[in-house]
């Protein structure tokens, strides 16, 4: 969620009571920044707290070494149960990197040589001309449908966690907004 439109960050125009309450009771990342403009290096930097040059992921085709320590490993060692729902875009055979459970995976395979599913009119969304957006027109995209699955799984997980009444770490990876 954009910091500029959240009550917990001082916006007085929008009403975000659920986010405000979560921020009051949880951890808020006030000084976070993106370590790379590219998806995989940025996400792996977030997991390791290391710049791309240190964790050795420079492109979307690079993968984080399975033995690279992440803050999720530390949470697991402290007795928490880190969960991931949805997109993380971890390339390579290790899709967990310290997460103990993953309910919904990425939108497509993240390992070279594995065929990706057909995205229909979304194929080529990253093209600078945005041809797929023109072809797609109004309506639901495959990314929106994926996000619906992720959102439903997240609601179920939060309900379960509330019943268990325990500290938790839940990472939710949505597709949208995304390219272009």
Where would I find each of the regions flagged by the language model?
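Formylglycine-dependent sulfatase
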Residues: 1-180
């Amino acid at each position: 969620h954009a910091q500029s439109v959240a009550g917990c960050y001082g916006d007085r125009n929008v009403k975000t009571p659920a986010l405000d309450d979560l921020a009051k009771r949880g951890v808020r990342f006030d000084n976070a920044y993106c370590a790379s403009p590219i998806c995989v290096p940025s996400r792996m930097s977030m997991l390791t707290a290391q710049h791309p040059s240190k964790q050795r992921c420079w492109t979307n085709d690079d993968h984080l070494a399975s033995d690279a320590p992440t803050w999720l490993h530390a949470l697991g060692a402290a007795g928490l149960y880190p969960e991931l729902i949805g997109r993380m875009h971890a390339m390579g055979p290790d899709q967990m990197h310290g997460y103990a459970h993953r309910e919904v995976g990425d939108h497509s395979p993240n390992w070279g040589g594995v065929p990706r599913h057909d995205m229909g009119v979304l194929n080529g969304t990253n093209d600078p001309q945005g041809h797929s957006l023109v072809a797609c027109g109004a309506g639901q995209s495959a990314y929106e449908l994926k996000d619906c699955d992720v959102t439903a799984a997240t609601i179920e997980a939060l309900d379960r966690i509330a019943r268990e009444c325990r500290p938790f770490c839940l990472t939710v990876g949505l597709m949208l907004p995304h390219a272009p």
